[in-house]
Protein backbone atom coordinates (compact mmCIF):
# COMPACT_ATOMS: atom_id res chain seq x y z
CA UNK A 1 0.00 0.00 0.00
CA UNK A 2 1.41 3.38 -1.03
CA UNK A 3 0.16 6.89 -0.51
CA UNK A 4 1.61 10.37 -0.37
CA UNK A 5 2.00 12.15 2.97
CA UNK A 6 2.59 15.91 3.01
CA UNK A 7 3.64 17.91 6.06
CA UNK A 8 2.50 21.54 6.07
CA UNK A 9 3.41 24.23 8.58
CA UNK A 10 0.19 26.26 8.81
CA UNK A 11 0.34 29.94 9.77
CA UNK A 12 4.03 30.16 8.78
CA UNK A 13 6.16 31.35 5.90
CA UNK A 14 9.22 29.29 6.89
CA UNK A 15 9.79 25.62 7.65
CA UNK A 16 9.88 24.56 11.31
CA UNK A 17 7.53 27.40 12.24
CA UNK A 18 3.77 27.61 12.61
CA UNK A 19 1.45 24.73 13.38
CA UNK A 20 2.37 21.46 11.62
CA UNK A 21 -0.18 19.08 10.15
CA UNK A 22 0.16 16.09 7.87
CA UNK A 23 -2.13 15.76 4.86
CA UNK A 24 -2.87 12.41 3.22
CA UNK A 25 -4.86 12.20 -0.04
CA UNK A 26 -6.70 8.89 -0.44
CA UNK A 27 -8.61 7.24 -3.28
CA UNK A 28 -10.85 5.34 -0.82
CA UNK A 29 -11.20 5.26 2.94
CA UNK A 30 -8.93 3.01 4.92
CA UNK A 31 -10.09 1.44 8.17
CA UNK A 32 -10.32 3.78 11.15
CA UNK A 33 -7.65 1.71 12.89
CA UNK A 34 -5.22 2.15 9.98
CA UNK A 35 -5.93 5.91 9.80
CA UNK A 36 -5.15 6.13 13.50
CA UNK A 37 -1.93 4.14 13.08
CA UNK A 38 -0.80 6.48 10.29
CA UNK A 39 -1.59 9.51 12.46
CA UNK A 40 0.46 8.01 15.31
CA UNK A 41 3.38 7.37 12.98
CA UNK A 42 3.25 10.96 11.67
CA UNK A 43 3.71 12.21 15.25
CA UNK A 44 2.16 15.65 14.70
CA UNK A 45 -0.86 17.07 16.51
CA UNK A 46 -3.26 16.34 13.60
CA UNK A 47 -3.24 14.37 10.38
CA UNK A 48 -5.87 15.19 7.75
CA UNK A 49 -7.10 12.48 5.39
CA UNK A 50 -9.21 13.37 2.37
CA UNK A 51 -10.98 11.95 -0.65
CA UNK A 52 -11.87 14.14 -3.63
CA UNK A 53 -15.53 13.49 -4.42
CA UNK A 54 -15.62 15.95 -7.33
CA UNK A 55 -18.14 18.48 -5.99
CA UNK A 56 -16.57 18.47 -2.52
CA UNK A 57 -13.72 17.01 -0.50
CA UNK A 58 -14.48 14.48 2.24
CA UNK A 59 -12.13 15.36 5.09
CA UNK A 60 -11.34 13.64 8.39
CA UNK A 61 -8.82 14.56 11.10
CA UNK A 62 -6.95 12.29 13.49
CA UNK A 63 -4.68 13.04 16.42
CA UNK A 64 -2.26 10.28 17.43
CA UNK A 65 -5.01 9.07 19.82
CA UNK A 66 -8.48 9.71 18.33
CA UNK A 67 -10.52 11.05 15.43
CA UNK A 68 -11.62 14.64 16.07
CA UNK A 69 -14.61 16.63 14.81
CA UNK A 70 -12.87 19.83 13.72
CA UNK A 71 -9.37 21.15 13.06
CA UNK A 72 -8.79 24.55 11.48
CA UNK A 73 -5.07 24.40 10.77
CA UNK A 74 -5.24 20.91 9.23
CA UNK A 75 -8.13 22.09 7.03
CA UNK A 76 -6.01 25.01 5.80
CA UNK A 77 -3.07 22.64 5.28
CA UNK A 78 -5.30 20.38 3.17
CA UNK A 79 -6.47 23.35 1.09
CA UNK A 80 -2.84 24.34 0.56
CA UNK A 81 -1.94 20.88 -0.76
CA UNK A 82 -5.03 20.78 -2.97
CA UNK A 83 -4.27 24.17 -4.57
CA UNK A 84 -0.48 24.35 -4.65
CA UNK A 85 0.49 20.70 -5.16
CA UNK A 86 -2.52 18.93 -6.67
CA UNK A 87 -3.64 22.00 -8.70
CA UNK A 88 -7.29 21.97 -7.58
CA UNK A 89 -9.00 24.36 -10.00
CA UNK A 90 -11.77 26.01 -7.99
CA UNK A 91 -11.02 29.12 -5.89
CA UNK A 92 -13.40 27.83 -3.20
CA UNK A 93 -12.92 24.36 -1.78
CA UNK A 94 -15.90 22.73 -0.05
CA UNK A 95 -15.08 20.18 2.62
CA UNK A 96 -17.57 17.65 4.01
CA UNK A 97 -16.62 16.89 7.63
CA UNK A 98 -18.04 15.52 10.88
CA UNK A 99 -18.78 19.16 11.80
CA UNK A 100 -20.65 19.86 8.58
CA UNK A 101 -19.55 21.76 5.50
CA UNK A 102 -16.46 23.97 5.67
CA UNK A 103 -15.30 26.29 2.90
CA UNK A 104 -11.81 27.56 2.19
CA UNK A 105 -11.32 30.31 -0.38
CA UNK A 106 -7.98 30.92 -2.07
CA UNK A 107 -7.39 34.57 -2.98
CA UNK A 108 -4.27 36.73 -3.37
CA UNK A 109 -2.10 33.77 -2.33
CA UNK A 110 -3.99 33.46 0.99
CA UNK A 111 -6.31 30.75 2.29
CA UNK A 112 -9.43 31.98 4.09
CA UNK A 113 -11.41 29.49 6.19
CA UNK A 114 -15.10 30.12 6.86
CA UNK A 115 -14.93 28.70 10.37
CA UNK A 116 -18.21 27.76 12.11
Language-model region placement:
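Anion-binding (especially nucleotide phosphate/pyrophosphate-binding) glycine-rich loop
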Residues: 34-68
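Short beta-strand-to-turn element immediately C-terminal to the catalytic PLP-Schiff-base lysine
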Residues: 23-26, 50-51
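Short, low-complexity Ser/Thr-rich regulatory SLiMs
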Residues: 12, 51-52, 106-108
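Acidic, low-complexity central loop/insert segments
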Residues: 56, 62-116
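N-terminal, positively charged, Ser/Thr/Ala/Gly-biased leader segments
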Residues: 1-16
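Generic N-terminal amphipathic, Lys/Arg-enriched alpha-helix
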Residues: 14-24
